[in-house]
């Protein structure tokens, strides 16, 4: 499998998250995905939706709340931000882009690419360990990762010109008694970068070319990856998976 850049999103938040897991399973080289999502809230694998969102509002307004396979905190998706994903097969090695074991090492590797891509767009950013990319104005991207014996996924959401007030209101639980068992999102000042999506994509391609010595060309999910996405879609569309308690065995892990 050659390195590839996947730019098209799937149809809707559940399908996009299903495709993320399908690519994690199927990728054996380097795949970078830059994609948008509908207005939605994406929660971490060990979170409880009602602790991380204004769930009543989301349900009332038809805003999907979808659990991802990676850990970490809740994020707002919608107009004004772009998601980036890095998939690396276990045997892939090219400069700083390589399979590493350990969440902090993965975050450092991924942040190196995103920070350099942001710099190429005129934005000074850096890694605030363990998993936040920040500028002088505030946090512009978080990161979450999943490691397996065959490969890894690290992804995040980069703020471009998002509605920060809506993002904050949708990821603020309303009148809920909290429980310490669940991973909680950490409040931090956030900021937009003002980067254009096309400029970010071009800059990412430039950084990858510097690291690998080759241009990363636009590609598509394979037939087997698309089939895996279709097979996974019922899970990511299931309220039990998305809204259920991750510690009570109701959501298949």
Kindly label every feature range from the protein language model.
Residues 75:
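Glycine-rich phosphate/pyrophosphate-binding loop regions near the starts of catalytic domains
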């Amino acid at each position: 499998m050659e390195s590839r850049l996947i730019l098209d999103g799937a149809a809707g938040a559940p399908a996009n998250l299903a495709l993320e897991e399908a690519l994690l399973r199927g990728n054996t080289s380097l795949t970078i995905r830059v994609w948008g999502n509908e207005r939605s809230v994406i929660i971490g694998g060990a979170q409880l939706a009602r602790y991380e969102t204004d769930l009543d509002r989301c349900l009332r307004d038809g805003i999907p709340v979808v659990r991802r396979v990676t850990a970490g905190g809740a994020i707002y998706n919608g107009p004004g931000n772009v998601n980036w994903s890095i998939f690396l097969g276990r045997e892939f090695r090219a400069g700083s882009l390589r399979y590493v074991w350990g969440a902090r090492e993965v975050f450092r590797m991924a942040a190196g690419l995103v920070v350099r891509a942001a710099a190429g767009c005129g934005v000074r950013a850096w890694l605030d360990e363990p998993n936040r990319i920040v500028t002088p104005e505030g946090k512009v991207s978080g990161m979450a990762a999943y490691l397996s014996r065959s490969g890894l996924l690290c992804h995040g959401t980069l703020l471009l010109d998002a509605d920060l007030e809506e993002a904050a209101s949708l990821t603020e639980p309303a009148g809920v008694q909290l429980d310490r068992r669940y991973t909680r999102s950490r409040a931090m000042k956030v900021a937009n970068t003002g980067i254009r999506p096309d400029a970010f994509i071009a800059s990412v391609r430039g950084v990858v070319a510097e690291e690998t010595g080759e241009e990363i060309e636009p590609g598509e999910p394979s037939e087997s990856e698309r089939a895996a996405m279709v097979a996974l879609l019922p899970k990511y569309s299931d309220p039990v998976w998305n809204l259920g308690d991750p510690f009570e065995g109701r959501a298949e892990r």
